[in-house]
């Protein structure tokens, strides 16, 4: 199912498929390693405030507005990184 990162729950693994936003947002996320095709795990998402994710063993916090610009899909066994 395709949705925004902010819609996912704790401990879910997802694959980033698109970034909605202007060049500045896109470049900032690319610099953080958030590129289409990368697998993320949601560490903390309580429905408000920032979201904590794990990316290749590194935890990072994203503001909710930024997380709403990330379009993700559920990870399948065949897509694990």
What spans do the regions from the language model cover?
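Ubiquitin-like/PB1-type beta-grasp interaction modules and other compact soluble beta-rich domains
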Residues: 1-7, 56, 62
């Amino acid at each position: 199912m395709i949705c925004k990162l902010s819609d996912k729950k704790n401990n879910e693994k997802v694959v980033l498929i698109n970034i909605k936003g202007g060049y500045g947002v896109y470049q900032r996320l690319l610099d953080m390693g958030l590129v289409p095709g990368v697998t993320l795990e949601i560490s903390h998402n309580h429905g408000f405030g920032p979201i904590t994710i794990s990316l290749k063993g590194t935890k990072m916090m994203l503001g909710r507005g930024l997380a709403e610009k990330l379009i993700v899909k559920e990870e399948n066994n065949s897509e694990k990184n």
